[in-house]
Design a protein with these regions (language model features):
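Primarily recognizes Gram-negative and organellar outer-membrane beta-barrels
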Residues: 1-497
Length: 497
């Protein structure tokens, strides 16, 4: 908050209350075949999910400012209160347990309510969760803002202390438990910034620490096997995760010369990061997951950005962005019956570069772009295959003012990937997107027709590498689409007295 002229102290209060009532009903046909196990091993499930949920949240905050004369120092004590009450049911019904409701049953159909409520309830995976959260945060901040030399020095130190109490009432199969957990955490924040040369140049250093609380349900002795190939367990020994982040940045901008430069370095490390250990059973093909705390995860990243006008009339413009990142990812991976070290550490180095050139003539604009990034992932694991892969893209963009007030935005880009061990990840996809729009009715109403992946080259299946160097597959039901937008702009001016 900027200091109002002639004011030495100020107070501010705010708050809100929010209520949500949601209900979701889902149907699922699931078939698991095990050909290696012989005949009669097919597992078919006709499932119906009913998941109503109610949430009420409330928040209040009081801030107080006090400026210490002309010293440049100001004090800001504050208090925040946040509360929430969440009640959720997850009712699962195995309809195939009724005669005539197997694989031949109509998808999305339900038998009589009495039949499926009494005879098909999946008590082992259904649950009722009622959780209340009370959170108090006391913060004391010191700020400094003053002219120093030929520039301006700003500094900030925040010392928030958070007191949290959570109460969970949980019912599931043989479990009916009510318990509470209290937590106190300290999350300091600090920032120092110096601006000079009429605020066009600056250097900034910041640090903050934050605590993430584990989910209370994760600590329960619960087995979830709704997906028979992915079983989830609980862990009563979980600890809260603590993240440390630090950053250093420098900027040098010249509006007169149309040159902009920035560079930065970021570091983050997590202690007791909450992840899931995985154990694979080769005989059954089942993965068993369990929440655990892991240490050793950190990220170091750097970036350099530069843009400039290439000619005196500033019609040609060039921009570049360079990024470099080092990830150290630690996870717990085991195989049933194996003697290998379950701790899996993967180091990934990422280097990326993006270059764009634009030409503008009046209200018309065309551009060319080129992007490339290289990824190298290594691990001491015996079963790990080193990753040396590159993603690159190149294309053209355009923004045109057409007759009759129409505007056209278009983008034609080739996306390519090379060097992946999984051949399905080495792809070339030419993607064309366009948007045609027009403003009418004194520019209050905008009509726009948008087309995404007009050439239908994008695959509905996306393959990515996670932090452990493993391939993850995602499916998009609608990779290509067309959409009509109708946007009305409403401006209500206050009446003059």
């Amino acid at each position: 908050m900027h200091r109002p002229k002639g004011i030495d102290a100020a107070i501010e209060a705010l708050g809100f209350v929010e209520y949500q009532d949601k209900s979701e009903k889902r149907f699922n046909h699931y078939t698991l075949d095990r050909p290696a196990a012989g005949s009669g091993t097919s597992d078919f499930r006709n499932r119906y999910y009913n998941t109503p949920a109610q949430t009420i949240s409330y928040y209040g905050q009081v801030n107080f400012w006090y400026w210490l004369g002309r010293s440049g120092f100001s004090l800001m004590p504050s208090y925040k209160y946040r509360g929430a009450h969440v009640e959720k049911d997850n009712d699962i019904y195995r309809l195939e347990q009724l005669a005539g409701w197997g694989s031949d049953a109509d998808f999305g159909a339900l038998p009589s309510e009495r039949e499926y409520l009494e005879r098909t309830y999946d008590a082992g995976n259904s649950f009722n969760r009622d959780q209340k959260t009370y959170e108090h945060t006391f913060d004391f901040c010191i700020r400094y803002n003053h002219e120093v030399g030929k520039g301006n020095l700003g500094a900030y130190l925040g010392m928030p202390v958070r007191l949290t109490k959570r109460t969970l009432d949980y019912k599931r199969a043989m479990i009916d438990t009510l318990f509470s957990k209290s937590n106190t955490d300290f999350s300091p924040k600090a920032n120092i910034r110096y601006n000079w040369h009429n605020w066009s140049r600056s250097v900034e250093l910041s640090y903050n620490m934050s605590t993430k609380l584990y989910d209370l349900v994760q600590t329960l002795d619960v087995r979830s096997d709704d997906n028979p190939l992915n079983v989830t367990l609980g862990n009563g020994a979980l600890k809260n995760a603590v993240t440390h982040k630090a950053s250093l940045s420098y900027t040098n901008n010249s509006s007169r010369k149309q040159r902009f430069f920035s560079a930065g370095v970021d570091y983050s490390a997590v202690r007791n990061q909450i992840g899931y250990s995985s154990e694979y059973n080769r005989a059954t093909g089942v993965y068993t997951y369990r929440p655990v705390n892991v240490n050793g995860n950190y990220t170091i990243a750097g970036n350099v950005n530069y843009s400039m006008a290439l000619d005196k009339k500033r019609r040609w413009n060039l921009s570049t962005a360079t990024t470099a990142q080092l990830y150290n990812n630690v996870d717990i991976i085991t195989v049933t019956g194996a003697d290998e070290n379950p701790r899996s550490k993967v180091k990934t180095f990422f280097l990326g570069e993006t270059v764009k050139v634009d030409y503008r003539l009046g209200r018309q604009k065309i551009g060319a772009k080129l992007g490339c990034n290289w990824r190298n992932a290594t691990s001491a694991r015996e079963d790990f295959a080193t990753v040396n892969a590159a993603n690159f893209n190149y294309g053209l963009t355009g923004q045109f003012e057409l007759p009759c007030g129409f505007q056209l935005f278009t983008d034609l880009t080739m996306y390519s990937r090379r060097g992946y061990e999984a051949h399905e990840m080495n792809t070339d996809e030419l993607v064309w997107n366009a948007r045609l729009s027009k403003q009418v009715w004194k520019k209050r109403l905008t009509l726009a027709l948008e087309g995404f992946d007009i050439l239908h080259n994008l695959s509905a299946v996306t393959h990515t590498l996670n932090g452990q160097g493993r391939t993850e597959t995602y499916r998009n039901v609608i990779p290509s689409y067309g959409m009509l937008h109708v946007i009305y702009r409403l401006n209500v001016q206050p009446k003059k007295k």
